[in-house]
């Protein structure tokens, strides 16, 4: 799923993110940013997916949540800033 359209890696990124969040160790911040980036992008794509039209608002909220988590870790993250600007 190189384009992330099917979200095949989504459950794995969610599991790793939950594990790293539970550790509450800044050493894992770069891995958390990687997880949040994938998940934010997945939900960003899901906003426009006609098959998921009913969940568009929820997907938008989830995407914003993940991009915002990235900015909480790295306030200068340009990708997260661009994604949030594009969503709003």
How would you label these PLM feature ranges?
Residues 17-31:
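Flexible helix-coil transition and linker loops at the boundaries of alpha-helical arrays
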Residues 20-23, 67, 74:
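Alpha-helical junction/boundary sensor with strong preference for TPR arrays
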